[in-house]
Structures are given as structure tokens and as C-alpha cells.
């Protein structure tokens, strides 16, 4: 049996005495898009931050997070990145006064630090995925549109050549046409073999792109299955796709 790229088992996360995740378990395989959908406050971003090791000092986590079979719970963020885990946060966190290319190169810092001689070579891969970024590589990131900034954020994460790419609300604040473009690129990334964990409130777009889906509500995984199956589930249709059963 092939080892999953990511396996999360019985993950609990608490902020002080308040538990935000109640034993969540998910699996993502190579070349697979897995999405987690759910309402605001369900714990979706908390889950990603726990996997990435980016929880704040006031948070505690219990459970197992396995990256290609290795338990990463004790690893700092930098080591998780070095071993193949990249997170694109909801806030994108670009250095707005730096150029597009300099922002991208920051994504390969761990590879540079480890002495990899081809640490810049991934730029061509990113520019092939995002031709617009090649055209604007000298432009300050802060002058880009929202969609272009999201492309920079995804491209920066890809500079680490991750085995697992995690995306937190990639469609947030973007125009519908740009959302379609971003999701087309996400599907293209799947074809490269990278495992993708997608947290998204745009349930329709997420389920169309994903292979497998989980529904998270108030810290609990309440439903899971093939994305196409969940997209036709009456409860998902009514609650997350904005349709009633008759119109569906």
C-alpha cells in the first residue's frame, strides 16, 4: 500500500481551554486534491496551521501529523518546509515593496540554506505556470492585483518544490474570472504529482476541482467522501452550494 503524502490522525487543537478541533483525521495522497469545506469558524484554518506547525503560542495540539510516513509533530516550521510541506496562508503575506521575483526566491530559502545548487531553477517551473509573473517579475508585489498577488503567493510556495501544498482560501476576495483561473492552475498542479490540501469557502469551486472532500463543522469532521459524491449530497447542496433540494 502506498504511503500517503499527508496523514492526520485524531488531531485536537485548543486555544487555552477552548478546543477548536475535536479529533480530526484526514488523508492526502500524491497527485490528489483534497478539500476541506465548512462555514466560518469551523476550524479549517486552524487545521492547516496545526499541520504546518504555525499555531500561535497560546495554542496546543495533540494527535499525529505524518508527512510521507514521518511524524512531524516535533519539527519546527522550517524543517517541515525543508521536508516537503508548503502553506499558502489566507493573508498571502507578500513583501509588498519587493519585486515579484524576489518574493518568489524567498520561497526557496530553505533549499538555498541546505546548499542545493539548483535552488533558483524552480523559477522556470513557476513562470511556466504563471506567465504573467514572468512578464512582471521586476514589478513591486504591492502594485499587483489581488489575483496576481495570489499567483505570487502560490508560486512562492512552489519554489520549495513541495510534496504537499496547502492552500488556505485561495479564492478569497477575487473576482469570479480570476477564481476560475486560480482553480485551473490548482488542477494543473495536481498533474505534476504534488499532493494538494485545499481549504475553501467556495464549496462549489472546491468540489469541482477536488478528488476527495471533508466537511468540517465546529471542529468536527461530519462528512467525507469523493468530491463528486458530496457535490450531489442533499445536505451539502442545501447548506454549502446555496441550492434547495428541488432546484438541485
Question: What is the predicted role of each segment?
Answer:
Residues 2-248:
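Glycine-rich phosphate-binding loops of nucleotide-dependent enzymes
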Amino acid at each position: 500500500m502506498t504511503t500517503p503524502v499527508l496523514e492526520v490522525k485524531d488531531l485536537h487543537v485548543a486555544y487555552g481551554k477552548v478546543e477548536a478541533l475535536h479529533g480530526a483525521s484526514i488523508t492526502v495522497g500524491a497527485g490528489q486534491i483534497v478539500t476541506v469545506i465548512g462555514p466560518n469558524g469551523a476550524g479549517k484554518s486552524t487545521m492547516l496551521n496545526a499541520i504546518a506547525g504555525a499555531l500561535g503560542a497560546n495554542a496546543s495540539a495533540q494527535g499525529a501529523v505524518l508527512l510521507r510516513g514521518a511524524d512531524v509533530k516535533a519539527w519546527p516550521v522550517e524543517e517541515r518546509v525543508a521536508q516537503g510541506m508548503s502553506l499558502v496562508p489566507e493573508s498571502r503575506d507578500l513583501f509588498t515593496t519587493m519585486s515579484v521575483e524576489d518574493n518568489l526566491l524567498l520561497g526557496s530559502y530553505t533549499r538555498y540554506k541546505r546548499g542545493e545548487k539548483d535552488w533558483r531553477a524552480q523559477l522556470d517551473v513557476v513562470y511556466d505556470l504563471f506567465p504573467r509573473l514572468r512578464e512582471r517579475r521586476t514589478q513591486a508585489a504591492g502594485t499587483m492585483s489581488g489575483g496576481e498577488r495570489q499567483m505570487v503567493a502560490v508560486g512562492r510556495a512552489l519554489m520549495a518544490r513541495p510534496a504537499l501544498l496547502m492552500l488556505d482560501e485561495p479564492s478569497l476576495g477575487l473576482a469570479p474570472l480570476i477564481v476560475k483561473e486560480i482553480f485551473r492552475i490548482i488542477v494543473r498542479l495536481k498533474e505534476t504529482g504534488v499532493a494538494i490540501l485545499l481549504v475553501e469557502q467556495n464549496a462549489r469551486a472546491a468540489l469541482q476541482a477536488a478528488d476527495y472532500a471533508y466537511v468540517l463543522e465546529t471542529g468536527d469532521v461530519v462528512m467525507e467522501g469523493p468530491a463528486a459524491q458530496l457535490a450531489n449530497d442533499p445536505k451539502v447542496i442545501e447548506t454549502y452550494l446555496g441550492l434547495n433540494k428541488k432546484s438541485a
